[in-house]
């Protein structure tokens, strides 16, 4: 069970105890009313006995007519004044009875209205209890969400550490790639110089081969001419015997030149083959080194790609978690707004209760002043009653009639007391409902403080992960503000309705009390026992004053709690502003990290581009080598 539920149960038990005390007080009041009725009956019997004694007094008066002759005139005057007083008293009693009947009807109507208001208040209390249960459930869900957020915060801290380590590794790889890039550029320059040298040697070899081809063509042509000449010489051998020796010498010279040229060609060919073999070996060694280097670079690039894909996956996971946390923050914001709305409603209720206490205090002061006036009037009437005791004998019949009227008025008074007791019970019920609302306000404020604390913790965790939360929070704040305004208007309308009902109840109760006190003042002319009712009224006033003091103490406590809640809200606002500044700083840090990551990705792409360019250059060199090998094989075949 939560602390709020325990406090609510204890409050319910206290209210049940108070209800039992009120029932006991009501039983005692009914017993007191029964005792009063018994005393009134006893007084009526005494009045009847006094009537019998008055007849004896009349007989004595007949015997002493001479002695009381002077008093007869006074008695007639007194009878006339008493008859006039009796008429006025009857008129007043009749008017009071009519007013009491009208008041009874009004009280019945007000009772019906009070029942309706009571039912509506009971429904509102049920709604408040339901909202309290919802707040408790929201509190439990917020606690579970807070635990989940703590776990996610720890996991995200681990992921942040991993990302930091990976960023350090990327920076180290970037530095290593930069140095390797410089080395590759230097090697590339050397390779370009070697390629230029090879191109120059190739061009020289090609020119030499062209010269050799031209010389071979010339030699082939000359050989063909020589063969034709030899054929013509063989055909003309017989005719040119004289010239045979010269031609033989020329042929031997030509053979010597051809053999010498063949020897020079073989030497040049062997020399070129040796140079080509050495260059080919150097090229193969360079190709092998470049292949190893390209393999290493490809492995490094593959590792970087895998790392980049892992980073993308981690980024996607973090994005999903940030969205989940955003949804949880939205729900916590809604719960916070709901609790703030309840705190506002409770504050309005406390203000209404304060106004009610002030009005009750004013009414109590008015009742005290009226009570003092009634006591003075009571003393004056008592003196007049003492003056008229001697003339009571002539009013026996009127006393009997007045006794009957007193009985009727007593029954009416008992009905009025019963209705007044019902109204007092209704007022105690309203006070109990007010206490329940006050306890609900206290619980709501405690839940608000707990949810505010959890909301601050969750906000601190979320501010390390997402920078776009401020816009959404502002939108949610606007929606919550509109919801708070509409709810506040509804609560104000309800408060106005309750206030009007209380004002009507107070006005009717005050009017009933005034009329009741006027009836008691009129009945005190005939019955001294009405002073006890006045004493009871004083006791009720004291009890009401004590209740007012209790209400003032309770309202003072409520005001102190409200001020504490306002200070807590101000502290929460300051923390929210501080967290907003931290969010801006974290946003700048995250943007700097994104820029560094993009820069590293650009450098990695540039390195991959350079590796691909080097691969293309190696392929070009390989193709050139193959072409040279083909040319050399063609030359060797020639």
Curated annotation (Swiss-Prot):
It comes from the Eukaryota. GO terms for cellular component: bicellular tight junction; myofibril; myosin complex; myosin filament. GO terms for molecular function: microtubule binding. Its main location: cytoplasm. Keywords: Coiled coil, Cytoplasm, Motor protein, Muscle protein, Myosin, Thick filament. Homodimer. Paramyosin is a major structural component of many thick filaments isolated from invertebrate muscles. Belongs to the paramyosin family. This is Paramyosin. It comes from Opisthorchis felineus.
